[in-house]
């Protein structure tokens, strides 16, 4: 029999089983522990008091480095430090309807290099481990339990391209929806991507009730490639075909995200292109006001009247359309704003001290939660 290590990691099944056998514990002990921590989000103190064996378990893989609460709305930015010493961010969004959404990161930095995105400007991605993705959920859930609030939705719309970390993101979703772990419905989870057709299809097949979103931002191939360099790898036709195939698997609307950029993609002609591209796909379009970033001074936000006019054109064609406005502007939690000088410095230090190529990482972006996610649950 393999002896249990001095401390074991919460989401490592083999390590946990070795610990159980080493301590000769009833299998129900760990079932109850996971139930209290992952479903009820009880505090560490409560878990340690109820289960002395928890002292031998690493309950968290992330260290909460800083918390910032918005003074103007219900957003909270959580800054976590990873074991590698780099920083990631999650955002809690307390919606006026009473729903609460957590926006999680899947990578440190991002390789997609979107022109409008702070993260994309700042470096090559380093994948977060499955346990680092899940610990964002655990720690946010514990905060919300203290407020007597429930976590309604989890969206992979934070830092990084989830489908560039497909293995760990998929495993995280497996555990989020596993009855013996978080036991969440897949319909409460959303994954947003800039467009990786094969990965989108794999997720849809594995989780038919999972919500998926595409960061489209233009229905003109040339324009999209300018603002999303990764668009060169997957054409608009390929993305349309992927969504069409996904909708033969999933009986639900597909989310389309469209960032409104002045004189780039916000004309009536752009709206008509979008309508034509969507065609007979069952989608919900979310129009997103742009938050300016220093690294892209040539990009500007569309005016509110232009956004509303664009929305009217889409609605007149029969498309479900929502204009979304930011939460957390005062704490830099809104789309494209999550950048920290400290992480720049840590990334520079990592470049000097680490030899592995995947250490060249860095910066943070959280996109706003997609409106309409709640309406998908029972479809």
UniProtKB/Swiss-Prot annotation:
Binds 1 [4Fe-4S] cluster. The cluster is coordinated with 3 cysteines and an exchangeable S-adenosyl-L-methionine. Residues 96-332 form the Radical SAM core domain. Its main location: cytoplasm. Keywords: 4Fe-4S, Cytoplasm, Disulfide bond, Iron, Iron-sulfur, Metal-binding, Methyltransferase, S-adenosyl-L-methionine, Transferase. One of its GO terms (cellular component) is cytoplasm. Its EC number is 2.1.1.-. It holds the Pfam family Radical_SAM. Disulfide bonds join 103-335. One of its GO terms (molecular function) is 4 iron, 4 sulfur cluster binding. It is found in: Cytoplasm. One of its GO terms (biological process) is tRNA methylation. Its cofactor is [4Fe-4S] cluster. S-adenosyl-L-methionine binds at residues 160-161, 192, 215-217, 291. It comes from the Bacteria. [4Fe-4S] cluster binds at residues 110, 114, 117. The active site is at residues 89, 335. InterPro entries: Aldolase_TIM, Methyltransferase_A, rRNA_lsu_MTrfase_RlmN/Cfr, rSAM. SUPFAM superfamilies: Radical SAM enzymes. Belongs to the radical SAM superfamily. RlmN family. This is Probable RNA methyltransferase RB6963. It comes from Rhodopirellula baltica (strain DSM 10527 / NCIMB 13988 / SH1). The lineage of its organism: Bacteria, Pseudomonadati, Planctomycetota, Planctomycetia, Pirellulales.
């Amino acid at each position: 029999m393999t002896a249990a290590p001095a401390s074991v990691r919460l989401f490592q099944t083999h390590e946990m089983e070795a610990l159980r056998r080493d301590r000769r514990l009833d299998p129900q002990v760990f079932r109850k522990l996971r139930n209290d921590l992952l479903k009820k989000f009880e505090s560490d103190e409560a878990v340690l008091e109820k289960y002395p064996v928890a002292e031998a378990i690493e309950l968290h893989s992330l260290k909460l480095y800083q918390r910032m609460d918005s003074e103007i709305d219900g957003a909270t930015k959580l800054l976590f430090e990873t074991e590698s010493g780099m920083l990631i961010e999650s955002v809690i969004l307390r919606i006026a309807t009473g729903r609460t959404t957590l926006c999680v990161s899947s990578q440190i930095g991002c390789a997609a290099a979107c022109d409008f995105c702070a993260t994309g400007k700042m470096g090559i991605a380093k994948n977060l481990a499955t346990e680092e993705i899940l610990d964002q959920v655990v720690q946010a859930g514990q905060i919300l339990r203290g407020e007597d609030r429930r976590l309604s939705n989890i969206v992979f719309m934070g830092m990084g391209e989830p489908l560039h970390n497909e293995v760990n993101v998929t495993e995280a979703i497996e555990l989020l929806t596993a009855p013996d772990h978080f036991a969440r419905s897949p319909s409460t989870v959303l994954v947003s991507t800039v467009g990786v057709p094969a990965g989108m299809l794999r997720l849809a097949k594995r989780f038919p009730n999972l919500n998926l979103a595409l960061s489209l931002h233009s229905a003109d191939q040339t324009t999209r490639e300018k603002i999303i360099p990764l668009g060169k790898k997957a054409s608009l036709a390929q993305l349309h075909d992927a969504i069409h195939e996904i909708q033969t698997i999933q009986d639900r609307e597909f989310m389309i995200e469209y960032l409104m950029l002045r004189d780039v993609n916000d004309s009536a002609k752009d709206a008509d292109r979008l309508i034509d591209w969507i065609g007979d796909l069952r989608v919900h379009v979310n129009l997103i006001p742009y938050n300016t970033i220093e690294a892209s001074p040539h990009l500007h936000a569309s005016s509110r009247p232009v956004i509303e006019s664009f929305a009217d054109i889409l609605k007149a064609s029969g498309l479900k359309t929502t204009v979304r406005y930011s939460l957390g502007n005062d704490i830099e939690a809104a789309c494209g704003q999550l950048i920290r000088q400290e992480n720049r410095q840590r990334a520079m230090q990592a470049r000097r001290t680490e030899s592995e190529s995947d250490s060249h990482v860095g910066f943070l972006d959280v996109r706003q939660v997609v409106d309409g996610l709640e309406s998908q649950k029972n479809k």
